[in-house]
A protein has these predicted regions:
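Hydrophobic anchor at the start of a short beta-strand
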Residues: 15-17, 270, 391-394
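Conserved flavin/dinucleotide-binding core of flavoenzymes
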Residues: 89-90, 96, 316-319, 333-466
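Short, well-ordered alpha-helices that flank and scaffold nucleotide-derived cofactor binding pockets
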Residues: 2-10, 32, 225, 284, ...
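Glycine-rich FAD pyrophosphate-binding loop
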Residues: 5-35
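Mid-domain catalytic core of redox enzymes
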Residues: 236-353, 360-367, 371, 379-384, ...
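Short glycine/proline- and charge-enriched loop/turn segments
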Residues: 33-41, 288, 411
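Active-site/ligand-binding neighborhood in enzyme catalytic cores
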Residues: 76, 96, 100, 113-242, ...
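Dinucleotide-binding Rossmann-like beta1-alpha1 core, especially the glycine-rich loop
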Residues: 36-125
Length: 466
């Protein structure tokens, strides 16, 4: 809606915009809780600074001075291997470890595994026509050991997914591009790093992930305030039960939204930013093909458990947290030492921890009651890193069918979806189900959707969305 107001003004297009939200509050999965001096995030706790859309929106909303980097000290992260935590090599996310010595001596990979990972430079590129799974791609390029012990929890964990089912080109298109352009991920990453250092920006230095000083809900508050100032009508707690289409006297479609209370809202353009399974139900009567394609986008359920412990009893804990490979067969997916990673998150005498459970193939634990879920997580924390203290604060946040899964064939299905909707100008889909699950991805996709709406309302023929 923000991008739509911006682009409509630039095009000289007058419009009246209404936003309907079924939840009683705004922000979707962005939910910040403030309890005294403790700040927790029920959903995402940060966003990638390398994707400019998030930073740009914060700047436009006057939040640039509220952006915070991760702490400078104690940056290390760990991975669990055979029941023990091992330091992850710095630079692993770019596949170019900054210090080879500690990595070689860590015991994470055998010498055979290390040599195989290093041979990535010599592995020929795969076919540009194949939609390879993320697991197949990473094993092919880096070997089985590196995949199972390092890369699977790092990459698949972002989507709470199963790398065997995830589409490489839909989830990590950059890896596909680097392989095709440079013949090697490592070679491509080094070239990208060299290019970035030669074109250093005058903008403030940002860590890979950034957040907002008082939590990400600041972004939601600033956005809703700005929209109301622009005259946008915001209606929370309003559920749409049906979407109908009728012919307009000027020869274009008109859309009728049938609300839960029986009333209706008519519009020349409708943007559905709902989960794919909700959009499927709304679109199926208009186009069964689109409804069926949307049904093919599965969702994973997850939960986050936040706990605050006395720092005096957890003084040995350092770094930013740890990840757990699927092969370790734990309930925990990962844990973040929130108060060590971010400033302004907890009093100095407390350690704030955020734990993650659930995801594809590991959702059974979510059926447990809160108390049992917390007990399970505490038991694993005690076993893995020795935290046996009683938490002084605990909260559980469950997210049912919250994380869309980009399975093999996802991009082809999006092309078919666009074709199925092409006969309904002004009807647009956007959100995390399609072209990226991160906050900057959704901001960018929302801006693309806004551009499509403006073109439709101006009566221009628009090209297919990228």
């Amino acid at each position: 809606a923000f991008a739509l107001q911006e682009q409509a003004a630039q095009a000289g297009l007058p419009l009246r915009c209404t936003i309907l939200e079924s939840d009683p509050s705004w922000g979707g999965k962005i939910v910040t809780h403030r309890i005294g001096d403790i700040v927790t995030e029920a959903g995402p706790d940060s966003f990638l600074s390398q994707k400019q859309a998030g930073l740009d929106l914060c700047t436009k909303l006057g939040l640039a001075d509220q952006l915070i980097n991760t702490n400078e000290t104690g940056k290390k992260a760990c991975v669990l291997h055979r029941g023990r935590l091992h330091d992850l090599p710095e630079g692993l996310l770019s596949f170019v470890p900054k210090q080879l010595g500690p990595f070689l001596q860590s015991g994470l990979l055998s010498w055979v595994g290390l040599v195989r990972m290093g041979l990535e430079f010599a592995v020929p590129p795969g076919s540009p026509r194949d939609d390879e799974s993320l697991a197949e791609f990473l094993r092919r390029r880096f070997g089985v050991q590196a995949y199972e012990r390092l890369l699977e929890p790092l990459m698949a964990g972002i989507y709470a997914g199963d790398a065997e089912q995830m589409s490489l080109r839909a989830t990590f298109p950059r890896f596909f591009e680097l392989e095709q352009q440079h013949g090697s991920i490592m070679r491509g990453m080094m070239a990208a790093k060299k290019s970035a250092s030669s074109s250093a920006s005058s903008q403030p230095r940002r860590t890979m992930f950034v957040s907002l000083k008082n939590g990400l809900s600041e972004l939601v508050s600033a956005l809703t305030t700005r929209l109301m100032q622009q005259g946008v009508e915001l209606r929370a707690g309003v559920q749409v039960d049906a979407l109908r289409v009728r012919s307009h006297e000027l020869g274009r479609w008109m859309y009728d939204l049938i609300l839960q209370d029986g009333s209706a809202l008519s519009a020349e353009s409708v943007v559905l930013a709902t989960p794919a399974y909700v959009s499927a139900d709304l679109l199926r009567p208009l186009t069964p093909i689109a409804g069926g394609l949307l049904d093919l986008i599965p969702y994973a359920s997850t939960a986050t458990i936040a706990m605050a412990f006395p720092r005096s009893l957890t003084s040995a804990i350092d770094g930013f947290g740890f990840i757990i490979p699927r092969q370790e067969q734990r309930h925990l997916i990962a844990a973040t030492w929130t108060s060590l990673k971010w400033p302004h998150r907890a009093p100095s005498d407390q350690l704030l921890v955020r734990c993650y459970v659930g995801g594809v193939g590991r959702e059974d634990i979510l059926q447990r009651e809160d108390q049992a879920l917390v007990a399970t997580v505490r038991e694993e924390l005690a076993n893995i890193c020795g935290i046996k203290a009683e938490p002084v604060y605990t909260e559980v946040n469950r997210w049912w069918k919250a994380m869309p899964q980009y399975t093999i064939g996802h991009l082809d299905r999006l092309v078919q979806l666009d074709a199925a909707l092409s006969r309904y100008p002004g009807l647009v889909l956007t959100g995390a189900a399609y072209r990226g699950v991160g906050i900057p991805d959704c901001i960018r996709d929302g801006a693309v959707a806004a551009g499509q709406v403006v073109r439709d309302l101006l009566g221009k023929v628009h090209p297919g969305r990228e």
